[in-house]
């Protein structure tokens, strides 16, 4: 019996200790310190203050003269603010209003009562509006509040309301040059057209003539190439700052040059032409619903996991290939409805600009092509092989973005269609496809550094240089598959294998393969849960997305599969289904300015 030990824990101990201190405080018993603030005296228990505040804990336990004093004078805070803070330390409750929060926050920061500081910040952020934003900024700055997340939430409000705030004199007065520069450099300002940001900057400069000395520096954070030419002529060149600022005149000249060189815009990649966008949107350019041709509409996968629709080129075009050059999209070839009412291979090329949500017709390819492959290397877009209704060919041509012209280059080694192309390490890899005899496992790489001379390219049908080089074949023959480069490797998904070309009898190829260029080897990975062809593919959040296509059960799909290359696993239903079942879709990730997305949101 004597050796038995049994432990007990009181469920009300913490509550009773707090209640005990409150009772002593209310009855005025054992109070051992008086705090003098302004003309007011506050009596309290040192032990209680030390448990609630790091400031008082150090004061009463460290070697400070106040440790043994019965009366302590505190300066730098108000009696009103401290009375609320003292009440919180005893009772755990506090009432805040816009009339008192200033003094309470001051007192809480003074005595290092972090919990009350957080309450004050949450209260202020919940109450923030255009009318009090400058006041709240000043309040947090005055007391050096740096609580995690507070500044981020304040900046988020400022960025969301930047233009209307810049019309308020109180905000213009308080906003510093340094803060203005940080906001103008932030991509979250994309909800406002660039001309509105420029006009906001003018308001800030005009508010105080002494600020004009910052004009040249500030102007460098305005992206004039994102404006329309009319805005630059009518609102920028006519302002007094255009005459005052050499930097502004330089930026305007750069923008006008950008507007004039329409075809070269994808190559003129500079800060002033870059979209303000924090995150790209998965974008689908659709071309077929079952066997029916549709206009090339654009679908956006937008949070919270919904699809939006934008307008596409006003021609019944099913683009077979897509190329991305610095956030410009080129849709090439495919099929279109001819004057005879039949579908024919197309040579048309369209360029999409998400900055203005606009389309531009570019120079046609030299020959109509469908079921071909493309790749972008430097300033060129390469189009490889393909077919028309009557002919399969091996010609290869490239589009020079600088002059909007096509020219033939060294042809592909064999006639082929239904193949896939992707650029890796500045080389264009072509995989699979259908030749004159069968579906192919072939992998061929095009190295532009080995291209023939102009004279050789002119005689393209007779001359084959060493531009094309065979690599290790895939494990499976396939056509109408998809390929994408990711982390220095090539991934191939799905497709079909044609067994009898005359009847186009085929079987599915659901396997996934990865190619390592360092070892020139293909490795088989996990197969797709539902095999398909004519699908789209892109990378999002370190996962490869496979969208739509024709499934092996004969049905067209609106589903999205995701593949994790690190875990070699497939998942379904990670993303919402597309609004329609699509075949022959082209997919990429694009940056859109928020003001374009806002307009799309209103239309959807």
UniProtKB/Swiss-Prot annotation:
Subunit structure: Homodimer. Dimerization does not affect PPP2R5B-binding, but is required for its proteasomal degradation. Interacts with CUL3. Directly interacts with PPP2R5B; this interaction leads to PPP2R5B proteasomal degradation. Interacts with RBBP8/CtIP; this interaction leads to RBBP8 proteasomal degradation. Interacts with PACMP micropeptide; interaction prevents ubiquitination and degradation of RBBP8/CtIP.
Function comment: Substrate-specific adapter for CUL3 E3 ubiquitin-protein ligase complex. Acts as an adapter for CUL3 to target the serine/threonine-protein phosphatase 2A (PP2A) subunit PPP2R5B for ubiquitination and subsequent proteasomal degradation, thus promoting exchange with other regulatory subunits and regulating PP2A holoenzyme composition. Acts as an adapter for CUL3 to target the DNA-end resection factor RBBP8/CtIP for ubiquitination and subsequent proteasomal degradation.
CDD domains listed in its UniProt record: BACK_KLHL15, BTB_POZ_KLHL15
Pathway info: Protein modification; protein ubiquitination
Gene for this chain: Klhl15
Subcellular location(s) of the protein: Nucleus
Primary location: nucleus
Keywords linked to the UniProt accession: Kelch repeat, Nucleus, Repeat, Ubl conjugation pathway
Tissue: Widely expressed at the mRNA level, with the highest levels in lung, muscle, and spleen.
Pfam assignment, any one: BTB
The protein's name in its UniProt record: Kelch-like protein 15
Record carries keyword Repeat: yes
Residue span, BTB domain: 31-98
Gene3D superfamilies: 1.25.40.420, Kelch-type beta propeller (2.120.10.80), Potassium Channel Kv1.1, Chain A (3.30.710.10)
CC annotations in GO: Cul3-RING ubiquitin ligase complex; nucleus
UniProt record, GO biological process: negative regulation of double-strand break repair via homologous recombination; nuclear protein quality control by the ubiquitin-proteasome system; protein ubiquitination; ubiquitin-dependent protein catabolic process
